[in-house]
Regions:
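A short glycine-rich, Lys/Arg-flanked "PGG" loop and its adjoining helix->strand segment in the class I
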Residues: 128-143
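Conserved class I S-adenosyl-L-methionine
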Residues: 145-168
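A short His-aromatic
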Residues: 122-123
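Low-complexity, charge- and small-residue-enriched intrinsically disordered regions
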Residues: 166-176, 228-237
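Acceptor-substrate binding/catalytic loop of class I
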Residues: 29, 167-188
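A SAM-dependent methyltransferase catalytic signature shared across enzymes that methylate proteins
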Residues: 186-204
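Conserved N-terminal segment of class I S-adenosyl-L-methionine
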Residues: 1-117, 127-132, 182-187, 204-240, ...
Length: 246
Protein backbone atom coordinates (compact mmCIF):
# COMPACT_ATOMS: atom_id res chain seq x y z
CA UNK A 1 0.00 0.00 0.00
CA UNK A 2 1.37 3.41 -0.98
CA UNK A 3 1.24 6.50 1.19
CA UNK A 4 -1.64 8.95 1.28
CA UNK A 5 -0.84 12.56 0.46
CA UNK A 6 -2.74 14.80 2.88
CA UNK A 7 -2.63 18.39 1.59
CA UNK A 8 -3.63 19.89 4.92
CA UNK A 9 -0.89 18.04 6.82
CA UNK A 10 1.65 18.90 4.13
CA UNK A 11 0.77 22.60 4.20
CA UNK A 12 0.98 22.70 7.99
CA UNK A 13 4.39 20.97 8.08
CA UNK A 14 5.68 23.07 5.20
CA UNK A 15 4.73 26.32 6.92
CA UNK A 16 6.12 25.33 10.32
CA UNK A 17 9.34 23.56 9.37
CA UNK A 18 10.28 24.95 5.94
CA UNK A 19 8.91 28.50 5.64
CA UNK A 20 9.72 29.24 9.28
CA UNK A 21 12.89 27.16 9.25
CA UNK A 22 16.53 28.15 8.80
CA UNK A 23 17.74 27.42 5.27
CA UNK A 24 20.01 29.02 2.68
CA UNK A 25 17.46 30.82 0.51
CA UNK A 26 15.90 34.23 1.18
CA UNK A 27 12.76 34.01 3.38
CA UNK A 28 10.17 34.49 0.61
CA UNK A 29 11.70 31.73 -1.56
CA UNK A 30 9.93 28.88 0.19
CA UNK A 31 6.38 30.30 0.06
CA UNK A 32 6.88 31.00 -3.66
CA UNK A 33 8.14 27.49 -4.46
CA UNK A 34 5.80 25.47 -2.26
CA UNK A 35 4.25 23.82 -5.34
CA UNK A 36 7.57 22.17 -6.26
CA UNK A 37 7.98 20.59 -2.84
CA UNK A 38 4.35 19.48 -2.85
CA UNK A 39 4.72 17.88 -6.29
CA UNK A 40 7.84 15.95 -5.27
CA UNK A 41 6.29 14.75 -2.02
CA UNK A 42 3.25 13.56 -4.03
CA UNK A 43 5.60 11.61 -6.33
CA UNK A 44 7.20 10.07 -3.26
CA UNK A 45 3.80 9.07 -1.89
CA UNK A 46 2.97 7.32 -5.16
CA UNK A 47 6.14 5.21 -4.91
CA UNK A 48 6.77 4.64 -1.20
CA UNK A 49 5.08 2.00 0.97
CA UNK A 50 3.20 3.06 4.08
CA UNK A 51 5.95 1.80 6.42
CA UNK A 52 8.83 4.17 7.38
CA UNK A 53 11.84 4.18 5.06
CA UNK A 54 15.46 5.29 5.19
CA UNK A 55 15.65 8.43 3.04
CA UNK A 56 18.57 10.61 1.92
CA UNK A 57 18.07 14.22 0.82
CA UNK A 58 21.11 15.45 -1.11
CA UNK A 59 21.12 19.23 -0.79
CA UNK A 60 19.16 21.50 1.51
CA UNK A 61 17.31 18.82 3.45
CA UNK A 62 13.80 20.25 3.09
CA UNK A 63 12.31 17.12 1.52
CA UNK A 64 13.98 14.85 4.04
CA UNK A 65 12.66 17.03 6.85
CA UNK A 66 9.12 16.81 5.48
CA UNK A 67 9.41 13.01 5.29
CA UNK A 68 10.58 12.95 8.90
CA UNK A 69 7.75 15.15 10.17
CA UNK A 70 4.96 13.64 8.07
CA UNK A 71 5.82 9.92 8.30
CA UNK A 72 8.68 9.56 10.78
CA UNK A 73 11.03 8.28 8.08
CA UNK A 74 14.68 7.73 9.02
CA UNK A 75 15.77 10.87 7.15
CA UNK A 76 19.33 11.93 6.38
CA UNK A 77 20.72 14.99 4.61
CA UNK A 78 24.06 15.24 2.79
CA UNK A 79 25.56 18.58 1.77
CA UNK A 80 28.90 20.37 1.60
CA UNK A 81 28.17 22.30 4.81
CA UNK A 82 26.23 25.31 6.05
CA UNK A 83 24.22 26.56 9.01
CA UNK A 84 21.07 24.89 7.66
CA UNK A 85 22.55 21.54 8.64
CA UNK A 86 22.47 22.56 12.30
CA UNK A 87 18.78 23.37 11.91
CA UNK A 88 17.80 20.05 10.30
CA UNK A 89 19.92 18.14 12.83
CA UNK A 90 17.98 19.86 15.63
CA UNK A 91 14.79 18.64 13.92
CA UNK A 92 15.92 15.02 14.12
CA UNK A 93 17.70 14.42 10.80
CA UNK A 94 21.05 12.68 10.53
CA UNK A 95 23.64 14.90 8.80
CA UNK A 96 26.59 13.93 6.62
CA UNK A 97 29.10 16.37 5.12
CA UNK A 98 29.66 15.18 1.55
CA UNK A 99 31.07 16.96 -1.47
CA UNK A 100 29.49 15.10 -4.37
CA UNK A 101 31.94 16.55 -6.88
CA UNK A 102 35.15 15.41 -5.20
CA UNK A 103 34.39 12.62 -2.74
CA UNK A 104 33.33 9.01 -3.10
CA UNK A 105 30.06 8.10 -1.36
CA UNK A 106 30.24 7.65 2.42
CA UNK A 107 27.30 5.21 2.17
CA UNK A 108 26.86 1.83 0.50
CA UNK A 109 23.45 0.29 -0.17
CA UNK A 110 21.86 2.13 2.77
CA UNK A 111 18.88 4.09 1.46
CA UNK A 112 15.45 3.15 0.14
CA UNK A 113 14.95 6.58 -1.47
CA UNK A 114 17.13 9.51 -2.44
CA UNK A 115 15.86 13.00 -3.19
CA UNK A 116 18.18 14.85 -5.60
CA UNK A 117 16.24 18.05 -6.16
CA UNK A 118 17.59 21.18 -7.87
CA UNK A 119 21.23 20.12 -7.37
CA UNK A 120 22.60 18.53 -10.54
CA UNK A 121 22.46 21.84 -12.45
CA UNK A 122 24.93 23.35 -9.95
CA UNK A 123 27.62 20.67 -10.42
CA UNK A 124 30.45 21.39 -12.90
CA UNK A 125 30.99 17.77 -13.92
CA UNK A 126 29.22 15.08 -15.94
CA UNK A 127 25.94 14.21 -14.29
CA UNK A 128 26.43 10.47 -14.66
CA UNK A 129 29.43 10.54 -12.30
CA UNK A 130 27.45 12.00 -9.39
CA UNK A 131 24.44 9.83 -10.21
CA UNK A 132 26.66 6.74 -10.07
CA UNK A 133 27.81 7.83 -6.60
CA UNK A 134 24.19 8.15 -5.53
CA UNK A 135 23.42 4.72 -7.02
CA UNK A 136 26.05 3.22 -4.69
CA UNK A 137 24.23 4.76 -1.71
CA UNK A 138 20.91 3.14 -2.71
CA UNK A 139 19.82 -0.28 -1.57
CA UNK A 140 19.27 -2.75 -4.45
CA UNK A 141 16.00 -1.68 -6.03
CA UNK A 142 16.06 1.66 -4.20
CA UNK A 143 14.73 4.71 -6.00
CA UNK A 144 15.90 8.24 -6.75
CA UNK A 145 13.70 11.25 -7.45
CA UNK A 146 15.62 13.96 -9.31
CA UNK A 147 14.27 17.37 -10.28
CA UNK A 148 16.15 19.96 -12.31
CA UNK A 149 15.32 22.95 -14.55
CA UNK A 150 14.44 22.14 -18.16
CA UNK A 151 17.00 23.52 -20.62
CA UNK A 152 14.20 24.52 -23.03
CA UNK A 153 12.05 26.26 -20.43
CA UNK A 154 10.45 29.52 -21.50
CA UNK A 155 12.66 31.59 -19.18
CA UNK A 156 15.82 30.43 -20.99
CA UNK A 157 14.34 31.18 -24.41
CA UNK A 158 13.54 34.74 -23.28
CA UNK A 159 17.00 35.18 -21.73
CA UNK A 160 18.66 34.05 -24.95
CA UNK A 161 16.47 36.36 -27.05
CA UNK A 162 17.37 39.46 -24.98
CA UNK A 163 21.04 38.53 -24.52
CA UNK A 164 20.81 37.90 -20.76
CA UNK A 165 23.28 35.44 -19.23
CA UNK A 166 21.60 32.09 -18.60
CA UNK A 167 24.26 30.17 -16.66
CA UNK A 168 26.96 30.81 -14.09
CA UNK A 169 30.57 30.44 -15.29
CA UNK A 170 31.59 26.79 -15.59
CA UNK A 171 34.44 26.33 -13.11
CA UNK A 172 35.59 24.34 -10.10
CA UNK A 173 33.91 25.79 -6.98
CA UNK A 174 36.20 27.31 -4.36
CA UNK A 175 34.73 28.20 -0.97
CA UNK A 176 31.08 28.32 -1.97
CA UNK A 177 28.60 26.70 -4.32
CA UNK A 178 27.89 27.78 -7.87
CA UNK A 179 24.78 28.97 -9.64
CA UNK A 180 23.38 26.95 -12.52
CA UNK A 181 26.41 25.97 -14.58
CA UNK A 182 24.37 23.81 -16.96
CA UNK A 183 20.82 22.64 -17.49
CA UNK A 184 19.56 19.46 -19.12
CA UNK A 185 17.19 18.61 -21.92
CA UNK A 186 15.03 15.55 -21.34
CA UNK A 187 17.12 13.33 -23.64
CA UNK A 188 20.41 14.54 -22.14
CA UNK A 189 19.22 13.83 -18.59
CA UNK A 190 17.96 10.40 -19.67
CA UNK A 191 21.39 9.63 -21.16
CA UNK A 192 23.19 10.71 -17.97
CA UNK A 193 20.91 8.58 -15.79
CA UNK A 194 21.27 5.49 -17.97
CA UNK A 195 25.05 6.01 -18.22
CA UNK A 196 25.23 5.95 -14.41
CA UNK A 197 23.78 2.44 -14.31
CA UNK A 198 20.42 3.42 -12.83
CA UNK A 199 17.48 1.59 -14.37
CA UNK A 200 13.77 2.00 -15.18
CA UNK A 201 14.20 5.70 -15.83
CA UNK A 202 11.11 7.80 -16.43
CA UNK A 203 11.28 11.58 -16.98
CA UNK A 204 8.46 14.04 -17.43
CA UNK A 205 8.07 17.76 -18.06
CA UNK A 206 6.40 19.49 -15.11
CA UNK A 207 5.07 22.98 -14.54
CA UNK A 208 4.94 23.92 -10.87
CA UNK A 209 3.31 27.36 -10.55
CA UNK A 210 5.40 30.01 -8.81
CA UNK A 211 6.10 33.76 -8.88
CA UNK A 212 9.51 34.77 -10.32
CA UNK A 213 11.69 37.08 -8.23
CA UNK A 214 11.95 39.90 -10.77
CA UNK A 215 8.65 41.85 -11.16
CA UNK A 216 9.20 42.24 -14.92
CA UNK A 217 9.70 38.51 -15.39
CA UNK A 218 6.74 37.87 -13.08
CA UNK A 219 4.49 39.71 -15.55
CA UNK A 220 6.09 37.93 -18.51
CA UNK A 221 5.64 34.58 -16.74
CA UNK A 222 1.90 35.06 -16.38
CA UNK A 223 1.53 36.44 -19.92
CA UNK A 224 3.39 33.47 -21.36
CA UNK A 225 1.73 30.85 -19.17
CA UNK A 226 -0.50 29.47 -21.99
CA UNK A 227 2.71 28.25 -23.65
CA UNK A 228 3.16 25.81 -20.76
CA UNK A 229 0.51 23.71 -22.50
CA UNK A 230 3.44 22.73 -24.74
CA UNK A 231 5.42 20.30 -22.54
CA UNK A 232 8.83 21.31 -23.92
CA UNK A 233 8.46 24.86 -22.56
CA UNK A 234 7.70 23.77 -18.99
CA UNK A 235 10.10 24.76 -16.22
CA UNK A 236 11.11 21.47 -14.65
CA UNK A 237 12.18 17.93 -15.44
CA UNK A 238 11.31 15.29 -12.86
CA UNK A 239 13.11 11.97 -13.21
CA UNK A 240 12.51 8.73 -11.33
CA UNK A 241 15.02 5.90 -11.60
CA UNK A 242 15.98 2.78 -9.71
CA UNK A 243 19.15 1.04 -8.56
CA UNK A 244 19.64 -2.44 -10.04
CA UNK A 245 17.90 -5.05 -7.90
CA UNK A 246 20.86 -7.42 -8.03
Amino acid sequence: MTRIYDAQKFNSAYLEFICKGSFNEIPDYYPRYRSRYAALIKKYCDLAPSTPLKVLDVGGGQLGLLCKKLWNDDAWVADIGGAHLDYVAAQGLQVKIWNLCSEEPPFKEEFDFIFFSEVIEHLPMPGHIVLERLKIALKPGGMIICSTPNLYRLRNIVYMAIGKQIFDYFRIPENHGLGHVMEYSIDHLQWQIEKSGLENCHIEYCQMPHSPNDPVFRVMYWMGSPLFLVPRFRDTLVAIAQAPSN
